[in-house]
Structure formats: C-alpha cells, structure tokens
C-alpha cells in the first residue's frame, strides 16, 4: 500500500522551477553574472545588454533557467554589497508591444507608476526616475526576444529606446540603472537585430550559445531533480541513465532537459497510480514512450510565423487525409487558397515559400525528398515527421495561429 507517495516536492518538476544551484552550466552562469557585477560594483551602474541563444530547432536546453538563475545571483551578490538590484522577467511572445512589456516590468518592480493610458515613453521615464529616487538598479530578462524583432507592433525606434534607455532617457545623476539579458531561440536573432537595430546588435557584450544537452549532462540534471523532489527510496541511478540515454544529444536524442524531466515525472506518476512505492525500469520505458508519442514542441511552434504554421497545418491535414506525401506544387496551391480564404492574409512569394519549407524541414517538423520515377517533371515531396500526431498537431497549430492573429503577428 502506497502511504506517502513518491514525491516529496512536486514543484521541483514544474517547468518554471529554478534549482538552488546549477550543476550543469555553472561556469556560464558565473561568467554572465560577473559581467554585470564588475560594472555595477565599480560604480558604473547597469547598462549591459547580453544575449543567450540556442541552436535552431532545439528547445528545453536551459536558456531561460540559466537567465533566471544568473539574474538572481546578480541580485543576491549586489545585496551583500549594499546595492539593490530588482529583477524582471518578460516573455516577449506574450507581450506584443512596448506598452505591454513596460507594464509587466513595472508590475514586477512594485513602483507606484501609473501605466494605464500612459504613453510607453512616459512609463519608461517614470521607471528611470523611480530607480534614481530609490537608488535601485534593474536587470530585465527579455525571453523569446526574437518575437520582439519580428513583431510589426514594435518599431525599431521603440526597441532602441528600450535597450539603450541610458542614452535616450539618462538618469538625473548620470548613473545607468537598467541592464538587459536577452534570451533568443537561436543565432538568427542576431541577424534580425543587425537588420532592425544594428546600433544595439553591435553593442551586445556577451553572446552565449547553448548547445543541446549530452546524456551525462541530462543525468546530472535528473539526479538533482530526483534528490530534491523524490523520496530517497523511489529511484535508482539506472532509471535516470535510461532517460538520459534516450534524450541525450550524443545518443541521438534532441538534448532536451525539459522532456527528460517530464519523462521522470510521468514515470513517478504512473507508479503512484498503480500503488507502487518505487520506480521500475518498465515504467520508465513506458513513460519515455508515451512522452515521445505526445511530443509536440509547443514552444518551438510558437516561434514560427503564421505562414509557416499554415504550411505545416496543410501538410498535417494531408497526412490525416491519408496522403503519405504531398508534392510542392499541390501544397503551394493549397497554401495560396488557405491564406486568402481561411486566414485573410496575403500568401508569400515563391522564394519565401521555399524558405519556409526549408526551415520546417531543418526543424525536423517536416520530411522532404525528391520525387521518383512515375511523376511528370522533378519536384519535392513533403510529409509530416512520423513522430508527430497529425490530429493533435493541427489542434495546437490552430490555437497558436489564432493567438498570433489576435496579437497582430504575421
């Protein structure tokens, strides 16, 4: 009979949980924190803009965790020196304009700043003034930063004013008080910055690329979560090794700590549901299998443009309709029709259309192959990646498209 359950702290398995220490990428966190602290403790204030980015198509590789951990460490180290560094976190995907971004930042500072109905520039000025009056500093994480660069509702001038606020709205005492840590999906964000705000891109101090996790790194992460969140008698090293070998990038996995942690959590929940008081290898394998089957990377899909999502949906629709492969010409025709009739957006030209297809293929969402004999002319055939459930994917894509269109994204 199961009396106490397998978990001693379920929060450890939440997606937003930040561990008390980073056993993997501790050096990267220390290097980032040192950049902010060196300037701050020398009396130069905060004005740094640094960036963390991943690899194309890789999610769950610790970018947000590293950013939040670093900012927390900066705040704690500054407090020991008698300085107050406030922290703010904004997911830019959910904040489509400068007003919303500033409103979220102000809310986290706790300053009595009136934001409703106020112009964004006035809010920013009030924030700078409050930091001066209180002699505080502010370190802001802008997650999903590439969303800000692609948003039609955030002008280049707005981005420049925000990230170079000490130039546009200097503090009354001349001390820079706002720093930024940008978190982007991959290196393409730097290219977008060069196009939209080259003056800021050239001044990014530290650009940190995070690769996907290897199996030994995933084991270390899982071990920490198990120690903090599970009862001691619940798990054995072999259970963690099994999961880390499945997801480790060096073992053919996608290197996602997020998926590895979810698999461990699922295995424990299965054991609890069966009345067991510990894990078994068969349950771990079952959890991994179910986690793989249900694996739709919502985070990854949210980073796609509306046009990429429309194309992906059409390919999934073809799969659901029993079409193993769809040729590029027919897909193009369906894309044009769907763009105009279903989504009321102008379809992109052929060059951009093929760029979208290449991107979807590079992410592993779509398979592509040249047509064989028996087809008139040479073309390319596409299908949904076999590991993705078409019906569930369509449901997720529809929700994302609806949210993007409501926010003015293309």
Curated annotation (Swiss-Prot):
What SMART domains does its record include? Answer: Cdc6_C
Q: Name one Pfam family in it.
A: AAA_22
Entry remark concerning the domains of this protein: Contains an N-terminal AAA+ ATPase domain and a C-terminal winged-helix (WH) domain.
Q: PANTHER family this protein is in? A: CELL DIVISION CONTROL PROTEIN 6 HOMOLOG, CELL DIVISION CONTROL PROTEIN 6-RELATED
InterPro entries tied to this protein: AAA_22, Cdc6_C, Cdc6_ORC1-like_ATPase_lid, ORC1/CDC6, Orc1/Cdc6_arc, P-loop_NTPase, WH-like_DNA-bd_sf, WH_DNA-bd_sf
The GO terms describing molecular function are: ATP binding; ATP hydrolysis activity; DNA binding
Q: Name the keywords, alphabetized.
A: ATP-binding, DNA replication, DNA-binding, Nucleotide-binding
Under which name does UniProt file this protein? ORC1-type DNA replication protein 2
For the keyword DNA-binding, the answer is yes
Q: Where does ATP bind?
A: 60-65, 213, 225
UniProt family annotation: Belongs to the CDC6/cdc18 family.
Q: Which GO terms describe its biological process?
A: DNA replication
Provide the gene name from the record.
orc2
The species this protein was found in: Aeropyrum pernix (strain ATCC 700893 / DSM 11879 / JCM 9820 / NBRC 100138 / K1)
Q: What does this protein do?
A: Involved in regulation of DNA replication. Binds DNA.
């Amino acid at each position: 009979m199961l009396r106490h359950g397998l978990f001693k702290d379920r929060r450890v398995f939440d997606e937003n949980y930040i561990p008390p220490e980073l056993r993997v990428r501790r050096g990267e966190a220390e290097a980032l924190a040192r950049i902010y602290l060196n300037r701050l403790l020398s009396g130069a204030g905060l004005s740094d803009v640094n960036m963390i980015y991943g690899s194309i198509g890789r999610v769950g590789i610790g970018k947000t965790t590293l950013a939040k951990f670093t900012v927390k460490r900066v705040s704690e180290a500054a407090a020991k020196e008698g300085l107050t560094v406030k922290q703010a976190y904004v997911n830019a995907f959910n904040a489509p304009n400068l007003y919303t971004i500033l409103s979220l930042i102000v809310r986290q500072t706790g300053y009595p700043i009136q934001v409703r109905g106020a112009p964004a520039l006035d809010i920013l000025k009030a924030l700078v003034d409050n930091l001066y009056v209180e002699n505080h500093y502010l370190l802001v994480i802008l997650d999903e930063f590439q969303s800000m660069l692609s948003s039609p509702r955030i002008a280049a001038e707005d981005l420049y004013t925000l990230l170079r606020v000490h130039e546009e709205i200097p503090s009354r005492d001349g001390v820079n008080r706002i720093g930024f840590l940008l978190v982007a999906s991959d290196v393409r964000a730097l290219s977008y910055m060069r196009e939209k705000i080259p003056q800021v891109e050239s001044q990014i101090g530290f650009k940190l690329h995070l690769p996907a996790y290897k199996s030994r790194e995933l084991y270390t992460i899982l071990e920490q979560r198990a120690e903090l969140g599970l009862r001691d008698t619940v798990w054995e090293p072999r259970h963690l090794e099994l999961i880390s070998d499945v997801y480790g990038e060096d073992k053919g996995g996608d290197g996602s700590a997020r998926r590895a942690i979810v698999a461990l959590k699922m295995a424990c929940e299965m054991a609890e549901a069966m009345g067991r008081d510990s894990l078994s290898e068969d349950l771990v394998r079952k959890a991994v299998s179910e986690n793989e089957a249900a694996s739709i990377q919502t985070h990854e899909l949210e980073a796609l443009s509306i046009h990429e999502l429309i194309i992906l949906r059409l390919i999934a629709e073809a799969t659901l309709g029993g079409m193993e492969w769809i040729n590029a010409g027919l897909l193009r025709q369906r894309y044009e029709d769907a763009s105009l009739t279903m989504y009321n957006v102008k379809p992109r030209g052929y060059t951009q259309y093929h760029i979208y297809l290449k991107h979807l293929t590079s992410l592993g969402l779509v398979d592509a192959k040249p047509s064989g004999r028996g087809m008139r002319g040479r073309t390319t055939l596409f299908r949904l990646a076999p590991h993705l459930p078409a019906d569930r994917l369509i449901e997720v894509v529809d929700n994302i498209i609806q949210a993007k269109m409501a926010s003015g994204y293309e």
